[in-house]
UniProtKB/Swiss-Prot annotation:
It is found in: Mitochondrion inner membrane. It catalyses: a ubiquinone + NADH + 5 H(+)(in) = a ubiquinol + NAD(+) + 4 H(+)(out). This is NADH dehydrogenase [ubiquinone] iron-sulfur protein 3. The lineage of its organism: Eukaryota, Viridiplantae, Streptophyta, Embryophyta, Tracheophyta. Its EC number is 7.1.1.2. It comes from Patellifolia webbiana (Patellaria webbiana). InterPro entries: NADH_DH_suC, NADH_quin_OxRdtase_su_C/D-like, NADH_UbQ_OxRdtase_30kDa_su, NADH_UbQ_OxRdtase_CS. Complex I is composed of about 45 different subunits. This is a component of the iron-sulfur (IP) fragment of the enzyme. The keyword Translocase applies. SUPFAM superfamilies: Nqo5-like (SSF143243). It is an enzyme of class 7 (translocase). It is a peripheral membrane protein. Belongs to the complex I 30 kDa subunit family. Keywords: Electron transport, Membrane, Mitochondrion, Mitochondrion inner membrane, NAD, Oxidoreductase, Respiratory chain, Translocase, Transport, Ubiquinone.
Amino acid sequence: MDNQFIFKYSWETLPKKWVKKIEKSEHGNRFDTNTDYLFQLLCFLKLHTYTRFQVLIDICGVDYPSRKRRFEVVYNLLSTRYNSRIRLQTSADEVTRISSVVRLFPSAGWWEREVWDMFGVSFINHPDLRRILTDYGFEGHPLRKDFPLSGYVEVRYDDPEKRVVSEPIEMTQEFRYFDFASPWEQRNGNEG
């Protein structure tokens, strides 16, 4: 079975309310779904005889601040039986919680923690939803587009106190003007 057959079969078999949009391309096939049907759709893709997407490769987050549902969560799946890949996408806002898929794919625990830590997207029924890449006292979610580049606090080791301290960031210069014109590219009109 080839990738296009699996994709077409899935589209024809699935309840239409589970899938908002489909996209076929040479880079891979994609289903867009509502958060309400995410778990059911992943169950179908993993357990059905003609799909068998039993490997969850990755879960990624993307932030689009101009959208109403600004966060996109992307699930990349692999069927080793049929040598096929598929991408499943859903979107959420700051308060929408997405169903955890740890019961279906145990490895999802780490990736869901990463998406929560970096973007603030929360997962319902996750067994251990806590920070994974940032410190426990860290405030905010650093991969959001509205997170300041310099962060909110500076964490450093204080040698006299022999401990790690967190202090508010103090900028010595609030605004910097960068001249992007290269002096090497300036030419006067007399050169031939």
